[in-house]
């Protein structure tokens, strides 16, 4: 699909977690198109280099920082190596579905670590600096699973509902100092080729009767990151094709 190039993020630095593929990569590319310098986070240096090269090929600025978001020391190092961050996109996430009674505790703990604890400690490290400067934007990437029940989705849905609760609390804590905090609750999005049938099945349940392209969600994220959304904070924006409305 077509992409839009603006310049309203010139001079700003954005950190996008999980930015080496799928939705995170689309977000990183669009933020760069809008003028931001992007810190691309991921675990795989090869994929990170590919994303950085894709951004630079379009005339953007980017660098890669590797980190394991299930490791608290790595999270703190990621924040330090990112430097001054004006836009934080907590996109990285993991998911596993399964019956509650049979759900493995180690899998549950890892989902909580990556999906909830990592955003918490990145905000803890970076939001005070934003507040001291009087501006900043934090965008948390959630899912319809945070508000719609799915069989086997209790653990994953809980992590996304928690992230949306953090958005509200961080709004109360940081927005008086000029830091805007919002959530994008994404619907089914084509991010992994091997799960296309799943996306299509869930997409058929939406009002638009289709799944989203990553770029469609990325446009919502970059809007919230920009001055065009200067009066928007504490919101959970449902970019879900109308799934939660019907």
Stretches with model-predicted labels:
Residues 128, 172-176, 230:
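Alpha-helical segment proximal to the catalytic Tyr-Lys
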Residues 99-100, 104-109, 138, 194, ...:
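Substrate-binding pocket helix/loop in short-chain dehydrogenase/reductase
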Residues 143:
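Residue(s) in the substrate-gating loop at a strand-loop-helix junction
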Residues 101, 148-154, 176, 209, ...:
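Active-site loop immediately N-terminal to the catalytic Tyr-X3-Lys motif
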Residues 120, 210-239, 244-245:
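C-terminal substrate-recognition "lid" of short-chain dehydrogenase/reductases
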Residues 123, 159, 167:
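Active-site helix of classical SDR
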Residues 13, 20-21, 44:
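Conserved glycine-rich cofactor-binding loop
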């Amino acid at each position: 699909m077509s992409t839009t190039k603006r310049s309203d993020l010139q001079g700003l630095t954005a950190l996008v977690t999980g930015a080496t593929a799928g939705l995170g990569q689309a977000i990183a590319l669009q933020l760069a198109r809008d003028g931001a310098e992007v810190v691309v986070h991921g675990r795989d240096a090869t994929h990170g280099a590919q994303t950085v090269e894709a951004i630079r090929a379009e005339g953007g600025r980017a660098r890669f920082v590797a980190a394991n978001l299930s490791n608290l020391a790595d999270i703190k190092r990621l924040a330090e190596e990112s430097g001054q961050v004006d836009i934080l996109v907590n996109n990285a996430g993991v998911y596993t579905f399964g019956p509650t009674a049979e759900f493995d505790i180690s899998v549950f703990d890892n989902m909580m670590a990556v999906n909830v604890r990592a955003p918490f400690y990145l905000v803890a490290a970076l939001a005070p600096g934003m507040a001291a400067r009087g501006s900043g934007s934090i965008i948390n990437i959630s899912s319809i699973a945070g508000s719609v029940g799915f069989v086997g989705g209790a653990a994953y849905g809980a992590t996304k509902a928690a992230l949306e609760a953090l958005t509200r609390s961080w709004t109360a804590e940081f927005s008086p100092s000029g830091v805007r905090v919002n959530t994008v609750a994404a619907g089914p999005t084509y991010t992994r080729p091997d799960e296309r049938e799943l996306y299509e099945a869930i997409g058929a349940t939406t009002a638009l009767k289709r799944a989203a392209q990553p770029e469609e969600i990325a446009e919502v994220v970059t809007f919230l990151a920009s001055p065009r959304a200067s009066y928007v904070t504490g919101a959970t924006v449902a970019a879900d094709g109308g799934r939660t409305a019907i």
